[in-house]
Design a protein with these regions (language model features):
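Positively charged n-region of N-terminal signal peptides that target proteins for export
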Residues: 1-4
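Hydrophobic h-region of N-terminal signal peptides that target proteins for export
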Residues: 9-17
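Flexible, solvent-exposed loop/hinge segments and secondary-structure transition points
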Residues: 18-173
Length: 173
């Protein structure tokens, strides 16, 4: 009887240990994460959607698409657009990816709250309308910035028009 009891204890202990090992993630999963990245192909499609919206508004714009680290994937300037708008578009995109917030929303929130009014003093952040984070499956995978649309509302509308909803790439959460 003692042998039978010992056998059952050993058998169930081994099977429990084996199951728990199978359900635990590998140790490297705590050290490395897989993430989705915005591709050049997607950046070109985002830019195409934005420039089509700009054309509907009879505007030429500068446009920047960045990855989540703030690196430029695509930078373009429409015909006749002032050269300062290219840097403004990049900084708007940087602000959007850094804060995971559309720059128009960030601008309005900063103006409404004296505690955040000094956000515009941080290097690289530009609290002007026209920057949006780019979302995929609930995560920011990059950003897009637009400058030269003629008004804050135009820059924001042109940036938001970049979305590729049929592929799950969005400009709002």
């Amino acid at each position: 009887m003692k042998i039978l009891t010992a056998f059952f204890i050993l058998f169930f202990s081994c099977s429990f240990a084996q199951r728990s090992a199978e359900t635990q993630p590998p140790p490297q999963a705590r050290l490395v994460k897989s993430v989705d990245h915005l591709t050049l192909e997607a950046a070109l499609e985002l830019a195409k959607n934005s420039t089509e919206k700009a054309a509907q508004l009879n505007k030429q714009v500068s446009l920047a698409v960045l990855d989540t680290a703030g690196n430029v994937i695509l930078l373009m300037r429409g015909d006749g657009v002032g050269i300062h708008n290219t840097e403004a578009a990049r900084r708007k995109a940087y602000t959007a990816v850094s804060t995971k917030t559309a720059t128009l929303t960030l601008l309005r929130n900063a103006r409404a709250n004296p505690d955040t009014n000094n956000l515009n003093t941080l290097p690289e952040l530009l609290l002007l309308s026209g920057g949006v984070p780019v979302w995929y499956r609930g995560n920011v995978i990059g950003s897009l910035g637009v400058a030269g649309g003629g008004s804050p509302e135009n820059d924001d509308a042109i940036a938001r028009a970049a979305a590729i909803p049929e592929k799950g790439i969005l400009t709002s959460k």
